[in-house]
UniProtKB/Swiss-Prot annotation:
Organism phylogeny: Bacteria, Pseudomonadati, Pseudomonadota, Gammaproteobacteria, Pseudomonadales
GO molecular function: ATP-dependent peptidase activity; ATPase binding; serine-type endopeptidase activity
Subcellular localization(s) per the UniProt record: Cytoplasm
Keywords: Cytoplasm, Hydrolase, Protease, Serine protease
PANTHER family noted in UniProt: ATP-DEPENDENT CLP PROTEASE PROTEOLYTIC SUBUNIT (PTHR10381:SF70)
Reaction it catalyzes: Hydrolysis of proteins to small peptides in the presence of ATP and magnesium. alpha-casein is the usual test substrate. In the absence of ATP, only oligopeptides shorter than five residues are hydrolyzed (such as succinyl-Leu-Tyr-|-NHMec, and Leu-Tyr-Leu-|-Tyr-Trp, in which cleavage of the -Tyr-|-Leu- and -Tyr-|-Trp bonds also occurs)
Protein's recorded name: ATP-dependent Clp protease proteolytic subunit
Length: 213
């Protein structure tokens, strides 16, 4: 399988034996085999699955940019099932989502925690969704550093700066006031899909796909 087709399968799919389903597409030129993720990418579907880290973030960013180049006026659908992860990796995805022209619709399947929840909320307004049994969790950023006392102080201040910035952005995307966000992210704050909708992290809970008439 090609490097580009590895999308977000990483450790979860490797644990299942590394097997990725293949689909056969018929065309006038004959048959062509795709791994399932590459085939869904043709439908403008991207998967963000597993811990958010640099390699996975680069793949997501590359796919967002590719789909924008293909059609800058058609929505992109980002499916999220993530426990969170690196803030810097997550922010590279966030900034790209805001930068590109197409709306990015976000859909939580399973869980969207920490940076996963942040990216879920960062989707286009009116196009952020959860499936009914998904869970969402927000909290303050985690960090740890060893070294000289002065360096520890520098890193501690940087974590506080990151926390403040994430709170500001979360307040913007949810419509909550900043003080509410500060209070609610002080500890791990788990929400059901319906509670996430009430809070403003998403716009609706999907029970069934709405088919075009």
């Amino acid at each position: 399988m090609s490097r580009n087709s590895y999308i977000q399968q990483s450790s979860d799919i490797q644990a299942a034996g590394g097997l990725v389903p293949m689909v056969i597409e018929q065309s006038a030129r004959g048959e062509r085999a795709y791994d399932i993720y590459s085939r869904l990418l043709k439908e403008r579907v991207i998967f963000l699955v597993g811990p958010v880290e640099d390699y996975m973030a680069n793949l997501v960013v590359a796919q967002l940019l590719f789909l924008e180049a293909e059609n800058p006026d058609k929505d992109i659908h980002l499916y999220i099932n993530s426990p969170g992860g690196s803030v810097t990796a997550g922010m590279s995805i966030y900034d790209t989502m805001q930068f590109i022209k197409p709306d990015v619709s976000t859909i939580c399947i399973g869980q969207a925690c920490s940076m996963g929840a942040f990216l879920l909320a960062a989707g286009a307004k009116g196009k952020r969704h959860c499936l009914p049994n998904s869970r969402v969790m927000i909290h303050q950023p985690l960090g740890g550093f060893q070294g000289q006392a002065t360096d520890i102080e520098i890193h501690a201040q940087e974590i506080l700066n990151i926390k403040a910035r994430l709170n500001e952005l979360l307040a913007y995307h949810t419509g909550q006031d900043l003080e509410t966000i500060k209070r609610d992210t002080e500890r791990d704050n788990f929400m059901s899909a319906s509670r996430a909708a009430e809070y403003g992290l998403i716009d609706s809970v999907y029970d069934k796909r709405q088919l075009a008439s």
